[in-house]
Amino acid sequence: MQVNVIERRPDNPSELYAGSQLGLFKTTDGGDSWADMGLELGECEIFSISLHPTDANTIYVGLDHTKISKTTDGGANWTKLPTIQPESAIPGCFPVRVLRMAIDPSNPEEVYAALEVGGFIRSLDGGATWEDMSQPFVDLSKKPHLANHILSDNDAEGMLDLHALTISAAQPGVIWIANRLGLFISDDKGESWREYGIDHYSELTYGRDILPSPHDPNVFYAALSDSARGQAGSLYRTSNLGKSWDRIDHDITI
């Protein structure tokens, strides 16, 4: 079994969820025992898990083939949500994956999904309907330094190769995304995006991940590398919502 994602309940460190090609599993004892949550995958596998910030029974699970399932009763029943695959999606050597999801803590009905390699979709009604919000990324790819392709001849591919997104409780409605070309921010729920400019702090700009601290919503961590298959990597931290960043992986050997 290959575990693609692990998610921890913020208010209960012993409760974790693990997603794989075999299913969704839950532990309430810190990993000593696991239970299958009964999510039928078909030909899909799980790549992301998002927990509702206030309702412990509501969970979103992102799969490949641009599919998302949701439970509102702790896994007793699951609903396949009517997600959409953006027209700009670029299936390469694997189906488009829902690689990361985020729920706005200030309005949990707002759910956002980052697709690899496919762009960005959002729901403003708890997953009942979805919108393709990828066009702003396509527009950004028209800037010469943001044009990039590996799997296709589409210069927007790099901008649509989304790896992570997150929302901090300290910034309601503000979305951060990490993709192949760096870090990007939306101040209007994904209607428009601007390049953050992580290259001012790091020579490595391939965005792997970005996450807020569970202890301080003003703190973010960003993982960067040199390329999809490269060996170089770095870890940065901001304590002021991205106004400045410091590298924190000095003197670490893996």
What does each model-found stretch correspond to?
Residues 1-254:
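Extracellular glycan-interacting surfaces
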